[in-house]
Amino acid sequence: MLQANGNELYVERRGSGEPLLLIQGMTGHSLHWGEPLLAALERDFELVLYDHRGVGRSAASDQPFTIADLAADALAVLDGLGIDGAHVLGISMGGMVAQELALAAPERVRTLTLGATYCGGDGARFTDETVVNALAAAILSGDPERKIRTGWEFNVSPRFATAEGNLERFSQVADQYPITLGMVIAQVQAIMGHDTSERLAQISMPTLVVHGSADQILVASNGELVAGLIPGARLELLDGVGHLFFWEQPERVAQLVAEHAVAARA
């Protein structure tokens, strides 16, 4: 555990190589990366995993926060571990946190990989209302199985959602350390206040933007917008893949992140 801005955060390190800070999305904790992705990434990096305040194995928290506050937590993780600079991979809400981290402390971010994320502002598209309503109804139903199943169906492609064993493997992760309704609301409020659209031009480190073309949570035009606003950013669209693209194509994602780091050193 590590103290970060008055919050006690769960932190884990695994693998060897240059450090890669992984920043999870809304409701996600460090197990939500999935073992296939982590095993692939640790062939090239020392992975720095942590759980957001009030989530997973981190201590409970009842204070409101912004995405910038979560970025300050991420920076505190690097400080607490004595890491001067790291490659950064942020997914969904974690991609928003990574944007703020790159803007606040660019000297600490060697490369930036933003996955399935959103910058706010003109042109950005938040989650469709019908999807939000379906997810909210599942969360409020009090039925854990319905909540996991509904979230799964909206977060991955239909083909992957129905393939044998995939939901069961995800459920084994999602059943652990369930998030409170209060923290879900706090994260939604933080996301709704997120807007880096007019500041992304300040990002100067090598940036890769990855998005699934079949993302139902944050449609792919969001990735196109983010990549277009960051000077020199490269966009990688994964065809037919949903929001949790790193569950659907873990080896490909690990390859993209590793190649991005190698290219930055060239």
Region locations from a protein language model:
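Flexible "cap/lid" loop of the alpha/beta hydrolase fold
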Residues: 99, 103, 110-141
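Short beta-strand/loop motif that positions the catalytic acidic residue
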Residues: 203, 209-211
